[in-house]
Amino acid sequence: MIDRLASGHFEVRAEIDGVPLMVMIDTGATTTVLSFEDARRAGYEPETLRFEIPIMTANGQASAARVVADEIRIGDIVRRRVPMMVAQSGRLERTLLGMNFIGTLSGFDMRGERLVLRD
């Protein structure tokens, strides 16, 4: 179970390619998008990526680059070969866990101030 933050969002510890990161669950995001800083932490060398894909973020329009996670893990839930994007530096404060991951689950439920992910 994931508790709702005071901000109203749900954030959870995920491991992306074995690197622990805090991600915000975003059912409005089509794709999982790494912040530039989290991409660096996860070993994607964002300075070498080509930011050619236009995306909309809470901060407005930005460009992103495509990458693929070998593995994303949230607790016992594991998905492999997950397509993701990396946002340009300074354009995304928090990595977003999008519907390309959430949609692979058998479901998710809101229970009061908690979110439950079901594999």
Q: Which ranges hold each PLM region?
A:
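Pepsin/retropepsin-fold aspartyl endopeptidases
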Residues: 1-22, 27-119
